[in-house]
């Protein structure tokens, strides 16, 4: 083999090696993209069942109805003895209640367990007559009549349960912001005493949009 043939053969070998080295990353990239897509789908599936401890939006990631927004209030139940009850009427801020004829579509309760939570609680929201004093007997009867959905939230050895939301639809009732004082959040501590540092309830009231102030507070 003369020198020119040897040089040509060497060039061809280098070309083949270069072609191989270029194709290898391409194949790896394709496999990585497939794996990333699979992990992304898996993460979305798992995320759907996770508790929403940080909750920047209404109903997790669900959007409000067109033309609606929401107002959040936070309730921290006091100590509730085993087998006893707690009730608190919904009191929205004055800046919202002045638009008392704006319609309300949904109420959502989100249970936020604190690090010491190790109990079982039942949570619901009910329309309560103004004459009711939210006594233990009255709240017990409302839990028993089955007239409203109830969220049973409990501690699990593997961590807190995924389902931490209760959604109450008021669309058919044509309820408005002025009606909210007639509704109350009710809690039943089933198995043991619920301490004050175990639980926080976030109540989101979805209502028609209200005008926002264009003047800074004094």
UniProtKB/Swiss-Prot annotation:
Pfam families: Cucumo_coat. It is found in: Virion. Keywords: Acetylation, Capsid protein, Ribonucleoprotein, RNA-binding, T=3 icosahedral capsid protein, Viral nucleoprotein, Virion. GO terms for molecular function: RNA binding; structural molecule activity. Residues 1-10 have a biased composition (Low complexity). Belongs to the cucumovirus capsid protein family. This is Capsid protein. It comes from Cucumber mosaic virus (strain FT).
